[in-house]
Amino acid sequence: MGFDKAPSAVSKAKQNIINANLDEFIGVHHVNFFNSTKEVFGNTTILFNPPYGERLNIDVNEFYKKVGDTLKHNYPNSTAWMITSDMQALKHVGLRTSKRIELKNADLDCKFVKYELYEGTRKASKL
């Protein structure tokens, strides 16, 4: 599933998904992610390419905190992956990563991190 506040980004993403013959597996919605909730049963995988400080003029640390809060409260039993070049902001997500991969996105040094989200606590979810 994908979300974006920009209608043009949603339109382009939908067309790319159709061109790749993946439209039965991937949905993209014109929604503010921070107002969204998980709508399917079972594990959901979410991929993030959040705005970097270079791309938008926002309070990046607050933005990343809101991403973490939304994931924690609205997406139980899901997996989230995020690519970012802002290692300081990544600390504000407030969730523990289960995997970290260093890579390049164009000429930016980035990390691709994985978050495993549980209902309640991780310990309780394993019982």
List where the protein language model places each region.
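Class I S-adenosyl-L-methionine-dependent methyltransferase catalytic core
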Residues: 1-127
